[in-house]
């Protein structure tokens, strides 16, 4: 068997927020790719992990050897010398590729950058198991909604004026100081911009450090307001969102730090957002492809029963305040492929990964891809077809995952009209 292209078995996580039973794409993919997986219809299936992360590594489908071990035996062939030199790793991929199926809101969270990741890992390896940063990209496979980054300053000022419950938590002095002193049109990086960020940090800190009793009282009042006076809110979808998330996490601080301070983002299938390290975000519902730097570090803020590290969270965030449209990514044309179907590239402004989506709208269509200068992982998400490389022709069905070595030309062939694949890869430049 060639060691340049081979099928992988990917593990799955059953976090509470995952879609239930067969409604989950994660469950469907896991069961279709491994007939021994019996879907439990009352259990959540949240994440499919594809990569070398030690928490849930992928395995060669035939030999059952871990991808991590396969790479460590021949890193120059599996990663490429330039990738080894750049990321200083000889047994792991610099990215982690996932499918997420989201039924309930995930915790509002942010991820440390590289410098802070090393510090937190050294201080508290239990809660911060990695020393790396974790920028992420999410591509919607179905309709998706989430929180991403702080709202523009004027929107937050309007919330403080219109929603007494938020003002009660933030406090009169901090609220007034924010409303009167923000400069929404400040240039990025200017002293005025830095002052804006300090004002926003003060508001967020007051919310995150409010007592549980205060949050509980004000949350119940906020939910009643959303039912009885929906016009008090500056966005028409906010009252419904508050009520829905309150059913999932009653009286939670996330109703304030999420619904009222963060952008509420909706993506149609094919749209994507990039989430920088140290930017607050949370996924609310939908199915997504997610790619990230290889880390599992999370600093949580709300909508979670898990450990909340409020002190580090408040101090580490960037406090950028862009509208949600600025965080969306435009797919790019991918010039190194030809033939039937369509390939688009999602290329975030970081060095660890990019993701290529390929779709076919006709049976028996074929598309050729030149080799890329680093390792890849490819998953089929819809339809049936084949992946061909290095003299092999392997069946590709929903949930089937493959490793592709550097510099290897690949062909995809559609057996069905709606054949779709996603390919995460890294290159040195």
UniProtKB/Swiss-Prot annotation:
Domain of life: Eukaryota
Cofactor(s) listed in the protein's UniProt record: Zn(2+)
A Pfam family recorded for this sequence: PMI_typeI_C
Pathway assigned to this chain's UniProt record: Nucleotide-sugar biosynthesis; GDP-alpha-D-mannose biosynthesis; alpha-D-mannose 1-phosphate from D-fructose 6-phosphate: step 1/2
Subcellular location: Cytoplasm
One cellular component (GO) term of this entry: nucleus
Record PTM N-acetylserine, positions in chain: 2
Phosphoserine sites (modified residues): 107
Induction: By D-mannose.
Positions annotated to bind Zn(2+): 109, 111, 136, 281
Main location, first listed in the record: cytoplasm
EC numbers on record: 5.3.1.8
Family, similarity comment: Belongs to the mannose-6-phosphate isomerase type 1 family.
Protein name: Mannose-6-phosphate isomerase
Organism listed in the record: Saccharomyces cerevisiae (strain ATCC 204508 / S288c)
């Amino acid at each position: 068997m060639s060691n340049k292209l081979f099928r992988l078995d990917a593990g799955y996580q059953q976090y509470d927020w995952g879609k239930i039973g067969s409604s989950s794409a994660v469950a469907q993919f896991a069961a279709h790719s491994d007939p021994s997986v019996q879907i439990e219809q009352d259990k959540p299936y949240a994440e499919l992990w594809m990569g070398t992360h030690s928490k849930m590594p992928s395995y060669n489908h035939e030999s059952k050897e871990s991808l991590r071990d396969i790479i460590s035996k021949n890193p120059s062939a599996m990663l490429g010398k330039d990738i080894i030199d750049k990321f200083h790793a000889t047994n792991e991929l610099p990215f982690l590729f996932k499918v997420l199926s989201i039924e309930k809101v995930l915790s509002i969270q942010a991820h440390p950058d590289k410098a802070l990741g090393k510090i937190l890992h050294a201080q508290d390896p239990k809660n911060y198991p990695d020393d790396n940063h974790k920028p992420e990209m999410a591509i919607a496979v179905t309709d998706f909604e989430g929180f991403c980054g702080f709202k523009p300053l004027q929107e937050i000022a309007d919330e403080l004026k219109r929603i007494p419950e938020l003002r009660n938590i933030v406090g009169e002095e901090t609220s007034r100081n924010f409303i009167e002193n923000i400069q929404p049109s400040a240039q990025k990086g200017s002293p005025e911009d830095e002052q804006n960020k300090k004002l926003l940090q003060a508001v967020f800190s007051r919310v995150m450090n409010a007592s549980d009793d205060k949050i509980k009282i004000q949350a119940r009042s906020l939910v009643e307001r959303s039912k009885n006076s929906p016009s008090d809110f500056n966005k028409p979808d906010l009252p419904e969102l508050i009520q829905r998330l309150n059913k999932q996490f009653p009286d939670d601080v996330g109703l304030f730090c999420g619904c009222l301070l963060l952008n509420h983002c909706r993506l149609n299938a094919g749209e994507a957002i990039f989430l920088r390290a140290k930017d607050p975000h949370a996924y609310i519902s939908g199915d997504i492809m997610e790619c990230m730097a290889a880390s599992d570090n999370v600093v949580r803020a709300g909508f979670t029963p898990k450990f909340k590290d409020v002190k580090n969270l408040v101090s580490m965030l960037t406090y950028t305040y862009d509208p949600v449209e600025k965080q969306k990514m435009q797919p790019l044309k991918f010039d190194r492929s030809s033939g039937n179907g369509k390939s688009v590239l999602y290329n975030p402004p970081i060095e660890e990964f990019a993701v290529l989506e390929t779709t076919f709208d006709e049976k028996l269509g074929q598309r050729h891809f030149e080799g890329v200068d680093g390792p890849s992982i490819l998953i089929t998400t819809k339809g049936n077809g084949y992946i061909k490389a290095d003299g092999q022709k392997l069946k590709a069905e929903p949930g089937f995952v493959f490793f592709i070595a550097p510099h290897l030309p690949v062909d995809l062939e559609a057996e069905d009209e709606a054949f779709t694949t996603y390919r995460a890869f890294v290159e040195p430049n």
